[in-house]
Regions:
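Small-residue-biased structural context
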Residues: 1-146
């Protein structure tokens, strides 16, 4: 059986790779490719965030009763990630490389810090708190990033 940590960390790495592809395309001035790459990143990131917010976090909260702990903090950070994605989408549409690349640095730092908290704390907590049946249900209900 896969662990929560292994499965969700894999999604982080997939999103990281897509984000790097989009950044490289913007830096190269290849706006068509940048649009495709960033759209793929945004779609995959939204799928990942939804997997957490609608499947993993509720299972963890139901099992532990912790509704105002780490999952609340992660949800708040998800709001910031979504805002940056919206701004960066606009930058690609306007072909504003300087603004995009500035936001890209902010997004990269945010994602690194966010992923570290999840991978080194929250996912392990989920693996410990959820029994095998609940873990299997979470992993079964997840949507693939594509």
């Amino acid at each position: 059986m896969s662990s929560i940590n292994t499965t969700f960390t894999k999604q982080h790495r997939q999103c990281d790779e897509m984000f790097a592809d989009a950044e490289a395309a913007v830096a190269a001035g290849n706006w068509q490719q940048a649009g495709q790459d960033f759209s793929a990143f945004a779609t995959s990131m939204e799928c990942h965030l939804t997997n957490e917010e609608e499947i993993l976090f509720p299972a963890f909260e139901d099992k532990t009763g912790m509704r105002e702990g780490p999952t609340m903090i992660m949800r708040d950070e998800h709001i910031h990630i979504r805002r940056l994605i919206n701004e960066m989408t606009s930058d690609i549409e306007q072909q504003d490389a300087d603004h995009y690349l500035g936001l890209s640095e902010t997004m990269l730092i945010l994602m690194q810090q966010h992923n570290t908290k999840e991978e080194q704390m929250l996912y392990d907590m989920c693996d410990r708190a959820l029994g095998d049946d609940a873990k299997d249900q979470v992993l079964h209900n997840m949507k693939d990033l594509g």
